[in-house]
Amino acid sequence: MSFLIVLAALAFLMLAAYRGYSVILFAPIAALGAVLLTDPGAVAPVFSGIFMEKLVGFVKLYFPVFLLGAVFGKLIEISGFSESIVVAAIRYIGRTRANAVIVLVCALLTYGGVSLFVVVFAVYPFAAELYRQSNIPKRLMPGAIALGAFSFTMDTLPGTPQIQNIIPTTFFKTTGWAAPWLGVIGSVAMLTAGLIYLEWRRRTVMATGEGYGGSAAEANAENQPKAPRSGLPHPLLSIAPLVLVGVVNYALTKMIPHWYGDNYALTADALPGLHSAINLPIKGVIGIWAVEGALLLGIVFVVVTAFGRVRAAFAEGTKAAVGGALLAAMNTASEYGFGGVIAALPGFLAVSSALKSVPDPLINAAVSVTTLAGITGSASGGMSIALAAMSDQFIRAAESAQIPLEVLHRVVSMASGGMDTLPHNGAVITLLAVTGLTHKQSYGEIFGITVIKTLAVFFVIAVYYLTGLV
């Protein structure tokens, strides 16, 4: 019975997400409903002592990353930098390679620190015009955007500032550059397989005589492709803040330990108002601080170099970015609190025991994380639930098998971006809404990319065991 309660809570949350209901509201309802069925008297203590503690802890650690990433992405958009990058990519790579152009631009923006949701809005108008001029069926476009924005630059390529690569740093005391060789190998494999798949789909569909086509939703003015604005910034200037974020992120990862050591004690000598000293283990925040510092410098760079363009839309743009960051952070934090509650239930012991039956530590972690990401429809949410419930188990198993925690970080991060893009995933729903397409028209290609992403993590595990590369 206790096992069925856990399954019911997970199924309820998945259904709520699929139906479009707010996870912020329904994650605590699902968690506390499970507690009510287990021990009615524990509902209030669990809510305050577990759910809210986990939620607040997540927000404390990660909200600045969500906020700075959203603001940076919005400034890249309103400055014209993202538009300039798209136009330059089309000019230099060519319209005949539409899939490669869109994948490259999306990858460049996400690896440079732009939120994947912002990338969808920024790239779509120009992607639509490119596909129209090349007479490539529009319904293939979401697959290309998914490969560029929702895959290797989100969780696999070393140093990516996306939250899916940052969350593991606090659990495993690693950095965003964990397991660089495995990350590069996994990224190349994912990109290569994805491009081959998309090109095969393009040839297959166009062989039937299908062209760009259209949809009823395209009548909506928001979804109409638009011509590039005049007077766009130079492409080299446009790409500079993305490069800056990557370079500063790497530099701070190396420099922060030298500045602060292993632990930093903040005492009343420095701040007389402190009632007691604050001891902060630095290793657990290196990855977060490095990304925050890099994004902050990226924001300053964009404001300074594109002040004329940014000034007019700065107030409204940053207001929208803050709203988006709050929503994204609270969604994931609620799922993290849900995971903490579920992990405390007796029924979860059965789940944990079943997962322990998978003897290999890396496969165990990969299956656990990607399954929960699929159930919740969220890479960061599924990973948060898994790590809230099983991170200690993962660490013990890896250390027992003498597997570096860097490898575990990379596997967990990649696994979170495996089955997350099922039909109820928020990014998938947003992508289809922005492009004016339906699941029936375009989810097939997105699912193909989902399969490639899921298989890639097991390919990387095999590479590690065969070569020992980290």
Q: Each PLM stretch: what is its role?
A:
Residues 25-28, 48-83, 108, 281-347:
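Core transmembrane alpha-helical segments of multi-pass membrane transporters/permeases
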Residues 5-17, 28-37, 66-71, 106-110, ...:
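Hydrophobic core segments of alpha-helical transmembrane domains in multi-pass membrane transport
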Residues 128-239, 427-464, 468:
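Membrane-core helix-loop-helix motifs of multi-pass transport proteins
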Residues 96-109, 136-153, 179-184, 188, ...:
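Alpha-helical transmembrane segments of multi-pass membrane proteins
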Residues 63-69, 92-129, 329-337, 358-396:
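Hydrophobic alpha-helical transmembrane segments of multi-pass integral membrane proteins
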Residues 19-23, 59-62, 73-83, 109-122, ...:
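Short helix-coil transition sites and intra-membrane helix breaks within transmembrane domains
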Residues 70, 84-86, 117-130, 159-171, ...:
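Re-entrant/interfacial helical elements at transmembrane boundaries that shape
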Residues 6, 38, 181-317, 434-435, ...:
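Long, contiguous bundles of hydrophobic transmembrane helices that form the permeation core
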